[in-house]
């Protein structure tokens, strides 16, 4: 990843120059379009409820709530002490102690339990968000487990004569996520004579519950066509929900089950998972001393990164303010939320370029989306699209004033990200990025025309355009290119357009976003959605029928996406694809139950507080 120095503050490599910042700071007193032979000056009221102009331009309104995280509040955050060298030194000592105590596999040579203990240790360090310190040890542990894997799975230890659900389910999930070739057919061993998953009568046996919990977790990394994984998910979901009714609601096991059912895998964010897992970790561990060291290390690492987040967040807020964004009252302002999401999928200290880049790209996309979908007129948008594709600020003089601010923000930010990416990749990627943006502008323009004319496309026509207008590609491309992972053309084409990975992420984002937003969009005059277009193509279907079909499409696409990420013997390493995949988890997280991007709900605010604003108590 491109390394950006954040000491003592974020590197100027991600900041606009002073003359660029001045160019971006614009007020919006007028709205005008230059036309041959006609000079038009519009006076606008930028409150979201009405816009007055001399020719009475009527604009649609998003009715979005304002920015929840004022720049004054962000800049006033008091720095925590965790950036001091002594905290880093303590964390480094603990890393060594954990390796000596917990990853000393000579202490795990009990043939009756050695496989499960290795899997549990790997699972713990991953869920606590500290696995990057133990890559070598994790590989050694998983190689050992894999050497005893067979067509019936594994038992708790290498000498076990009976396969074990907990060990096999956890092993299937963990080995698959690390690129080992393991078949889900091993789960058939745990079916009864009727071919069904079954359990004992006493659902309160904690060991059995944990086995089913890991069966549920394993079912989420299913590949296409794996019927047994579908059956495992159905059985385990029902079982765990029933278990929650029978075990104490305040118990650690209950909290763990609720978290796993709530977030799953595709909607989970690693840093949020780490923060939540700290609250339940260690309660069922026999080696309390070792568990305490592991938990202390996790908390220290969480807070050391938190001290870096404070500086990055202040940079993001300054960038947002200096870019003229506060004057863009027609759009949503979710830059702080986007930074929290970026931090939750990339919390290695050296990935600053990715975090800042994703935050800025997401903000640009949000501004553009609201401008094209809601605020701009078709004439204005056609002019903006043609002008920005020229990539020449001197060509923007005929744009309305509010569009000039948007133009300059996009122009400077994309150029700056290209310079950061060039340092990481050793080549100029600006033209590549511009191609992604131009395709996005065209897709936005197409949707604006549909809105203006009331045209309802076919489902196929809508989805082809919607994959591009989902804007995953420009959001992900430049941040990924800042990574310290080389992306030569042949690798980049397997991660970005026209790869299957990119296509699936865009499909899922478009369809999932539609299922959460189509009613609000329709209320604003946007008729086209995957739901309405599918109903048009299939007369007689109800809205519920269409929603069910779209949800099945999403489910199938997720399975295909799992395969694209994890397929064995792949020429493209998982590490090269993982950040694009994790960005898809960001979108999933925000659309879990509702549109969490347009309207920041309690969960969104809690995410920002728990993963960015507040350190974890030591």
Curated annotation (Swiss-Prot):
Which segment of this protein is annotated as the motif DDXXD motif?
Answer: 369-373
Q: Where does Mg(2+) 2 bind?
A: 369, 373
Q: What class of enzyme is it?
A: lyase
Q: Where does Mg(2+) 1 bind?
A: 369, 373
Instruction: Give the GO terms filed under biological process for this record.
Output: diterpenoid biosynthetic process
**GO CC field:** chloroplast
Please give the catalytic activity noted in the UniProt record.
Answer: (2E)-geranyl diphosphate = (1S,4R)-camphene + diphosphate
Which residue pairs form cystines in this protein? none
- Cofactor binding mode, per the note? Binds 3 Mg(2+) or Mn(2+) ions per subunit.
Instruction: List, alphabetically, the InterPro entries matched.
Output: Isoprenoid_synthase_dom_sf, Terpene_cyclase-like_1_C, Terpene_cyclase_plant_C1, Terpene_synth_N, Terpene_synth_N_sf, Terpene_synthase-like, Terpene_synthase_metal-bd, Terpenoid_cyclase/PrenylTrfase
Q: Which cofactor does it need?
A: Mg(2+); Mn(2+); K(+)
Read off the domain note. Answer: The Asp-Asp-Xaa-Xaa-Asp/Glu (DDXXD/E) motif is important for the catalytic activity, presumably through binding to Mg(2+).
| Extra remark beyond the main annotation | The conserved 59-Arg-Arg-60 motif may play a role in the isomerization step of the terpenoid cyclization reaction sequence.
Protein task: Involved in defensive oleoresin formation in conifers in response to insect attack or other injury. Involved in monoterpene (C10) olefins biosynthesis.
For this entry, the protein name equals: Camphene synthase, chloroplastic
Query: What is the species of this protein?
Result: Abies grandis
Q: Which gene encodes it?
A: ag6
């Amino acid at each position: 990843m491109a390394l950006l120095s954040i000491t003592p503050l974020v590197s100027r490599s991600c900041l606009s120059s002073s003359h660029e910042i001045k160019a971006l700071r614009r007020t919006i007193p007028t709205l005008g379009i230059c036309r041959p032979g006609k000079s038009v000056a519009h006076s606008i009221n930028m409150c979201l409820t009405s816009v007055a102009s001399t020719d009475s331009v009527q604009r649609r309104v998003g009715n979005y709530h304002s920015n929840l995280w004022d720049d004054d509040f962000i800049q006033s955050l008091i720095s925590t002490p965790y950036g001091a060298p002594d905290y880093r030194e303590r964390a480094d000592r603990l890393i060594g102690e954990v390796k000596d105590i917990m990853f000393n596999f000579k202490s795990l040579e009990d043939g009756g339990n050695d496989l499960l203990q290795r899997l549990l240790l790997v699972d713990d360090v991953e869920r606590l968000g500290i696995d990057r310190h133990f890559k070598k040890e994790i590989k050694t542990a998983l190689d050992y487990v894999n050497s005893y894997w067979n067509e019936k799975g594994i038992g708790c230890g290498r000498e076990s004569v009976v396969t074990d659900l907990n060990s096999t389910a956890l092993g299937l999930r963990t080995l698959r996520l690390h690129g080992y070739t393991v078949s889900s057919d091993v789960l058939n061993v745990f079916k009864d004579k009727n071919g069904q998953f079954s359990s004992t009568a006493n659902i309160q046996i904690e060991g059995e519950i944990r086995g089913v919990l890991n069966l549920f977790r394993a079912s989420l990394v299913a590949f296409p066509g794996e019927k047994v994984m579908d059956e495992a998910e159905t059985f385990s979901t029902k079982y765990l929900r029933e278990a929650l009714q029978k075990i104490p609601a305040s118990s650690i096991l209950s909290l763990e089950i609720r978290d796993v059912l709530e977030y799953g895998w595709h909607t989970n964010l690693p840093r949020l998972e780490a923060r939540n897992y700290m609250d339940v970790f260690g309660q069922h561990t026999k080696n309390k001393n070792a568990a305490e060291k592991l938990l202390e290390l996790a908390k220290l690492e969480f807070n050391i990164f938190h001290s870096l987040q404070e500086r990055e967040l202040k940079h993001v807020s300054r960038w947002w303010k200096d870019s003229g964004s506060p004057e863009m009252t027609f759009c949503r302002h979710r830059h702080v939320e986007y930074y929290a999401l970026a931090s939750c999928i990339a919390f290695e200290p050296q990935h600053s370029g990715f975090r800042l880049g994703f935050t800025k790209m997401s903000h640009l996309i949000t501004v553009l989306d609201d401008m094209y979908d809601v605020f701009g007129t078709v004439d204005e948008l056609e002019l903006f699209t043609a002008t920005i594709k020229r990539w020449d600020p001197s060509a923007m003089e005929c744009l309305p004033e509010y569009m000039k601010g948007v133009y300059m923000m996009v122009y400077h930010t994309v150029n700056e990200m290209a310079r950061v990416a060039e340092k990481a990749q050793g080549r100029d990627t600006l033209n590549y990025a511009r191609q992604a943006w131009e395709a996005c502008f065209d897709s936005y323009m197409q949707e604006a025309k549909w809105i203006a004319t009331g045209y309802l496309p076919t489902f196929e026509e809508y989805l082809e355009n919607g994959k591009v207008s989902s804007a995953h590609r420009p959001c992900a491309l430049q941040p990924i290119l800042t990574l310290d992972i080389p992306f030569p053309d042949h690798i980049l084409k397997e991660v970005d357009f026209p790869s299957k990975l990119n296509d699936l992420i865009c499909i899922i984002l478009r369809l999932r976003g539609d299922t959460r937003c189509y009613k609000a969009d329709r209320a604003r005059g946007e008729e086209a959605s995957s739901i309405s277009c599918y109903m048009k193509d299939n007369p007689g279907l109800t809205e519920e029928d269409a929603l069910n079909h779209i949800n099945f499409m999403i489910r199938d696409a997720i399975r295909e996406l799992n395969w694209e990420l994890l397929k064995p013997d792949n020429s493209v390493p998982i590490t090269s694809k993982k950040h694009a995949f994790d960005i898809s988890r960001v979108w999933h997280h925000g659309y879990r139950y509702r549109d969490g991007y347009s309207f920041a709900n309690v969960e969104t605010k809690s995410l920002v507080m728990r993963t960015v604003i507040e350190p974890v108590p030591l």
